């Protein structure tokens, strides 16, 4: 079975690039000929992985909306595929892939990547998105063989927008492996990992450290990531305003630098209002590190499996979660870490997720029964 994905494996794209890469890798390990087409790389671009077949379009995006007139032709020039799979929405390459699949007479899937959450639609280019939804996207979604989402909340948002196509709920995968770096100091360190973006509410952690005062004086907040320069400047100004000497900006890290930085953290926090999954949670739980997330994120398992804190999206609750993380004993955090690692091994491994995705493709190709995760 030949599958062509359209998306990106560029590391700066964050979680979507990582989960797309791991999905491709897992599918190929299970005998599926999965490939990807994406825009050409810039000199500074780093890939999440380069051991899966990649094709590059002949042109780069011409506008902020990603308009690339030759993208559809580039897809069709690659030959025949059984199924086409687009990663993300509001993107020209997704429209092009859906159109190419229909021209080839083949089924296609679309993975929205959390971009159909009402908060995401409202926070940027809302007018364009609503116009695009009515003009083109909803039709593409409803003509898809299936829409793939990562949690039930995302499925609900799709239905509320008028998506009537079958929807498959399959979470993102995480690579199960041993990580050589271990925590080397006794500092109770709260980490943030991800894009530096206003949507991520990183200031919620800075506000928590300010509110805790002496309770956090011996702790540290480590912010790992890059992105919106203006927002980062605002965060640095906030730190300076509060006189916090225990907040550190590490910038974008990858490879061993990232592994070492994460290993130094006692707890990771994802204080954003919403995520369709939040690959950061996968990345830290597999390393045996507990996590804080808000209830706008589909991570009730942090609470039910005792591997972190799942709290309402309010500053008071985020501050209280940070307080509890700072006050927890080493033994408590270690137990939470073991629970998180076990959860990842049981439900989120690359092999497990690739098996589900393969069964979804086989159903679409009329070669297998409808999986139970398709609604």
Task: Describe each model-derived feature in a short phrase.
Residues 103, 129-146:
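Membrane-proximal helix-turn-helix segments that form the acceptor-binding/catalytic region
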Residues 290-294:
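Short hydrophobic beta-strand element within catalytic cores of glycosyltransferases
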Residues 153, 173:
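Carbohydrate-associated surface elements
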Residues 273:
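Aromatic "clamp/platform" in nucleotide-sugar-dependent glycosyltransferases that forms part
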């Amino acid at each position: 079975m030949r599958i062509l994905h359209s998306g990106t494996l560029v590391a700066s794209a964050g979680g979507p690039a990582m989960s797309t890469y791991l999905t491709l890798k897992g599918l190929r390990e299970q005998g599926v000929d999965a490939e990807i087409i994406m825009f050409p790389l810039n000199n500074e671009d780093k890939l999440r992985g380069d051991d899966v077949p990649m094709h590059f379009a002949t042109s780069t995006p011409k506008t902020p909306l990603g308009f690339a007139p030759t993208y559809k032709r580039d897809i069709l020039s690659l030959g025949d595929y059984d199924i086409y799979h687009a990663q993300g929405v509001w993107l020209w390459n997704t429209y092009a892939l859906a159109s190419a699949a229909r021209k080839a007479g083949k089924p296609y899937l679309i993975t929205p990547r959390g971009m159909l959450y009402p908060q995401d639609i409202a926070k940027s280019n809302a007018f364009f998105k609503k116009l695009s939804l009515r003009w083109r996207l909803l039709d593409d979604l409803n003509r898809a063989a299936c829409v793939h989402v990562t949690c039930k909340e995302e499925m609900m948002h799709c239905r509320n927008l008028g998506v009537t196509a079958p929807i498959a709920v399959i979470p993102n995968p995480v690579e199960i492996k041993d990580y050589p770096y271990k925590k080397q100091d006794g500092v109770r360190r709260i980490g943030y990992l991800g894009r530096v973006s206003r949507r991520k509410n990183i200031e919620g952690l800075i506000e928590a450290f300010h509110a805790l005062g002496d309770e956090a004086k011996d702790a540290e907040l480590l912010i790992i990531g890059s992105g919106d320069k203006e927002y980062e400047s605002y965060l640095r100004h906030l730190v300076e305003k509060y006189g916090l000497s225990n907040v550190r900006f590490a910038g974008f890290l990858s490879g061993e630098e990232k592994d070492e930085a994460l290993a130094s953290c006692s707890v990771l926090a994802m204080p954003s209002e919403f995520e369709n999954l939040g690959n950061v949670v996968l990345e830290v739980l597999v390393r045996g590190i507990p996590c804080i997330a808000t209830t706008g994120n589909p991570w009730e398992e942090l609470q039910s499996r005792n591997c972190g804190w799942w709290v309402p999206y309010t500053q008071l609750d985020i501050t209280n979660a940070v307080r509890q993380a700072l006050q927890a004993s080493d033994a408590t955090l270690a137990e939470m870490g073991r629970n998180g690692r076990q959860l990842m091994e049981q439900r989120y491994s690359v092999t497990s997720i690739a098996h589900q995705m393969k069964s979804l493709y086989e159903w679409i190709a009329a070669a297998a029964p409808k999986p139970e995760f398709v609604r």
